[in-house]
């Protein structure tokens, strides 16, 4: 979480703000001074509470709906709450067991990502989202080349996590089947278990240093690998539970909901937001306008990077209304990131 430009609040104001936001998140109704007098645990009169609430409204942490005598938090109020007032409720043992069971090591990467997004959605009751690792970060296990015609070659890549990608490439020249087999055998023997970027760089380096008898094979390998081992445009993000937001009271404006679902469909804006958080350790929270995207102004996004073997692979998180249970969802997202990262360290997935 990041620090915010928060006003200095005395202990009574902090306690009232904490109680008001917690009650509003729970009930979804504006909170008045009488309710706070009963539940804030302060020995002060309702009149004093009203004065403090007025001060909190003056500094932009609360607002007063026209139809109610109570108050509700603003986006700034939520920011102060998550940065300094929220009291975390980590997932229970049963929830952690569920996560570990669903994200069991040994499953393929795409299966793990799908399970992670579904579990986040089910446990948050909102939208679960997981950005996929770039294929360039994965080791490849095996490659085959099949000539399709005089100019096109099918490259079949099997990665260490058992995912298979088929890529049609157009090398600089036509290749005989025997040549393709020779190049595939060379790449498999020399580079199985290494990441794609490492292989391309190593091939170019070896070509510069090669002796004459190796130059032709290396040149052919560079020609084919320059296209076959470039990361393909794959599924960049997995989402689950989008329709859960259709029944959320705070997201009842149909025009804004339509904009939100268009962002879900295109994925581009959300993926860009996730990319902004990939190098930031721990949980990050974007509340409303903090996302920088009009389509996401009515929601909050709670994210955390997941990593395996010391390498950050992607980001996962929950998208929901600003009125969400931050105390529960912040530690849930961090736990899910830890469990997914541990599963990705398995030999069956990396």
Curated annotation (Swiss-Prot):
UniProt keywords, alphabetically: Repressor, Stress response, Transcription, Transcription regulation
Any one Gene Ontology BP term: negative regulation of DNA-templated transcription
Q: Which domain of life is it from?
A: Bacteria
Which GO MF terms does the UniProt record name?
Answer: DNA binding
Q: Is Repressor a UniProt keyword of this protein?
A: yes
- Any Pfam family from its record, for instance, is HrcA
- Does this entry carry the keyword Repressor? yes
Q: State the function annotated in the UniProt record.
A: Negative regulator of class I heat shock genes (grpE-dnaK-dnaJ and groELS operons). Prevents heat-shock induction of these operons.
The UniProt entry's sequence similarity note says: Belongs to the HrcA family.
| Protein name, as recorded | Heat-inducible transcription repressor HrcA
Which organism is this entry from? Xanthomonas euvesicatoria pv. vesicatoria (strain 85-10)
């Amino acid at each position: 979480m990041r620090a915010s430009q928060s006003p200095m609040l005395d202990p009574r104001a902090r306690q009232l703000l904490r109680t008001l936001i917690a009650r509003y998140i729970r009930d979804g109704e504006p909170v008045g001074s009488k309710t706070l007098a009963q539940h804030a645990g302060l020995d002060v009169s309702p009149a004093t509470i009203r004065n403090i609430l007025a001060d909190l409204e003056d500094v932009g942490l609360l607002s007063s709906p026209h139809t109610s005598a109570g108050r509700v938090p603003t986006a700034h109020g939520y920011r102060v709450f998550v940065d300094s007032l929220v009291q975390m409720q980590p997932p229970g043992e049963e929830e952690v067991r569920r996560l570990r069971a669903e994200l069991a090591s040994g499953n393929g990467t795409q299966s793990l990502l799908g399970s992670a997004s579904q579990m986040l959605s089910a446990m948050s009751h909102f939208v679960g989202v997981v950005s996929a690792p770039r294929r360039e970060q994965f080791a490849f296990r095996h490659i085959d080349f099949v000539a399709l015609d005089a100019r096109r070659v099918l490259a079949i890549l099997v990665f260490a996590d058992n995912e298979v990608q088929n890529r049609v490439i157009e090398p600089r020249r036509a290749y005989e089947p025997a040549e393709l087999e020779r190049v595939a055998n060379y790449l498999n023997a020399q580079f199985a278990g290494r990441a794609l970027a490492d292989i391309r760089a190593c091939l170019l380096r070896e070509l510069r240093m090669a002796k004459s008898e190796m130059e032709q094979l290396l040149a052919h390998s560079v020609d084919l690998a320059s296209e076959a081992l470039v990361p393909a445009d794959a599924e960049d993000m997995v989402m689950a539970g989008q329709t859960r937001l259709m029944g959320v009271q705070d997201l009842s404006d149909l025009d804004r909901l339509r904009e939100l679902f268009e962002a879900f469909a295109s994925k581009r804006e959300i993926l860009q937001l996730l990319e902004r958080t990939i190098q930031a350790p721990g949980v990050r929270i974007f509340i409303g306008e903090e996302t920088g995207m009009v389509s996401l102004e009515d929601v909050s996004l709670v994210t955390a990077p997941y990593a395996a073997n010391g390498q950050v692979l992607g980001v996962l998180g929950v998208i929901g209304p600003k009125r969400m249970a931050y105390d529960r969802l912040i530690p849930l997202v961090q736990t899910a990131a830890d469990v997914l990262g541990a599963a990705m360290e398995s030999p069956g997935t990396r």
